């Protein structure tokens, strides 16, 4: 089922795509692919250009996921490629007893997560087997992560998402690999 939860967030900020395309693209991409400080909070040419928590920004997405996947305080959610885990944080604000887990390859991203979710986050690659039981999570989400994988890695990641989740929501912005 094709659903769109995130586009409104992307349209809420201005972006200069042309400026980013005429930059030293190869070197910028190599720096961004490290997924550390420069990607998250460094110059915009490498990634987000300052990915800060804005109270309530992810709340509409969290509400839609909770509603559409029938989540409650007894549910469990895994976020594959959670970054700074702002969506998991907003979900915890709405459902304080929601069991969450999230992983990312970025030490900087995970270190920037809010305290109430940070204990449930760990370093892991989306394309490696997940350390969870079959159907352990009521919902597995992945937003803005999988398009960074090579095709052979993507196949493993999608199989793992299907294996550990009863339901899944995957967002792909683009796929250029």
Q: Which residues make up each language-model segment?
A:
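A conserved beta-strand element that flanks and buttresses the S-adenosyl-L-methionine
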Residues: 141
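Short catalytic micro-motifs in class I SAM-dependent methyltransferases
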Residues: 144-145
